[in-house]
Amino acid sequence: MHHEELILTLCILIVKSASKSCIHRSQIHVVEGEPFYLKPCGISAPVHRNETATMRWFKGSASHEYRELNNRSSPRVTFHDHTLEFWPVEMEDEGTYISQVGNDRRNWTLNVTKRNKHSCFSDKLVTSRDVEVNKSLHITCKNPNYEELIQDTWLYKNCKEISKTPRILKDAEFGDEGYYSCVFSVHHNGTRYNITKTVNITVIEGRSKVTPAILGPKCEKVGVELGKDVELNCSASLNKDDLFYWSIRKEDSSDPNVQEDRKETTTWISEGKLHASKILRFQKITENYLNVLYNCTVANEEAIDTKSFVLVRKEIPDIPGHVFTGGVTVLVLASVAAVCIVILCVIYKVDLVLFYRRIAERDETLTDGKTYDAFVSYLKECHPENKEEYTFAVETLPRVLEKQFGYKLCIFERDVVPGGAVVEEIHSLIEKSRRLIIVLSQSYLTNGARRELESGLHEALVERKIKIILIEFTPASNITFLPPSLKLLKSYRVLKWRADSPSMNSRFWKNLVYLMPAKAVKPWREESEARSVLSAP
């Protein structure tokens, strides 16, 4: 007797568990603002009180780190037996969840969908069902998961309430198509929540026989290119057991390069009717495939329909006049734009180089072992008629190049200790400099500066250890005697000083800095000097 009761109890448990079957889904979609719960399949509560089966829950973050959930994690998240409940679920709850009992681990990815304010349901949570016309349409609103908490239930069609009783049982009509939403009102801890389940009902034609028919024109020409692969696609409206096949009207139809793709027959339902498509494949089209009938046929014992395809050589069209004209116009405009860009680059070459030096922080002075960035050669004697030249060399140049741009100049009167051998000292200082700046004037060559000039020219033109920058304080055409070697200097290394070039943004100073070595030293600036380099210090 005890054995029979045990078998009966087991049968009841099997039937009960079957009625509440559990399917594990790794991806779950829910809508924000509704109650939801997670429960692993195949785990039940302990049979005896002395058994321990502690369920632990974890939530993953974007950095794949997991934190354990508890009663303090959120007032909306509760634990009941082996269930993780959300009252309700919100957007911030989206993520990966893991349950663990001993060595048993289950995981889910929870995707929370934002509620559509203009609809009573979310498109991502809609299930679909096809119903044949004049067959039973049965819709019942049930939610066994919250059965004990549901207080009210409503049934909507396309978001309009249609029935006081949440149930439909009738013969389906085409007008019954639509979105049916069951809305359950659930109360929990004094708060009311709504749960929505929506199904999309599509009413289709009955499975009565239709007359088989090929879709589209009865004859179709298809342009092809020799050597290319081609596919012909034929579609038909038919019944489930109708014949549907390709045939070739050709004496030798056993070409292995022409194959009917039997595995890729595609079927679908449209307006309640069954449709299918078949593909005929050609590998590397040749002349033999052209102007031949390839027939697609659908048939049953009552009717037959055929469509013919003919392959013809595709004509390569000439370039339309407007396309040719447009292409030429684009080409001309591109050429003009390129020329303009080149011209602008030539005109603004100095500005572009200085900009590049500034952003790249290039420094050409780090590894050459030299002490000075430039040796300034100028008229040493300050007579009233040469005062402007002298002031320019010993005051203006250092104030701009040293204070504004961070260069280190060698000024003879400032940096040379008196009493040494002048010629040897000058030669040594020029060797330690990266540039030789010559301030050329009418009196320059008649002065002792001639020694500096000869030494610098030797370094520049013979040993190629230094580059010369010539500043014409007096136009060279007004100088009676000019060494031939100076005439060998490239024109861009000859700068002409004008009294109207006080601003540091003037072309003279930009060209001078361009000819100086690139240096990444951040200059020390005085705002007053930035306005006018000729102002008194």
UniProtKB/Swiss-Prot annotation:
GO terms for cellular component: interleukin-18 receptor complex. It is a single-pass type I membrane protein. InterPro entries: Ig-like_dom, Ig-like_dom_sf, Ig-like_fold, Ig_sub, IL-1_rcpt_fam, IL-1RAcP-like_ig, TIR_dom, Toll_tir_struct_dom_sf. It comes from the Eukaryota. Keywords: Disulfide bond, Glycoprotein, Hydrolase, Immunoglobulin domain, Inflammatory response, Membrane, NAD, Receptor, Repeat, Signal, Transmembrane, Transmembrane helix. Residues 348-537 are cytoplasmic. Pfam families: Ig_6, TIR. Residues 20-326 are extracellular. It is found in: Membrane. GO terms for biological process: inflammatory response; interleukin-18-mediated signaling pathway; natural killer cell activation; negative regulation of cold-induced thermogenesis; positive regulation of NF-kappaB transcription factor activity; positive regulation of non-canonical NF-kappaB signal transduction; positive regulation of T-helper 1 cell cytokine production; positive regulation of type II interferon production. Its EC number is 3.2.2.6. Residues 33-102, 134-189, 212-312 form the Ig-like C2-type domain. Disulfide bonds join C22-C41, C120-C159, C141-C182, C234-C296. The TIR domain mediates NAD(+) hydrolase (NADase) activity. Self-association of TIR domains is required for NADase activity. Belongs to the interleukin-1 receptor family. Forms a ternary complex with IL18 and IL18RAP. Within this complex, IL18R1 is involved in ligand-binding and IL18RAP in signaling leading to NF-kappa-B and JNK activation. Interacts with SLC12A3 in peritoneal macrophages; this interaction is increased by IL18 treatment. PANTHER family: INTERLEUKIN-1 RECEPTOR FAMILY MEMBER, INTERLEUKIN-18 RECEPTOR 1. This is Interleukin-18 receptor 1. The lineage of its organism: Eukaryota, Metazoa, Chordata, Craniata, Vertebrata.
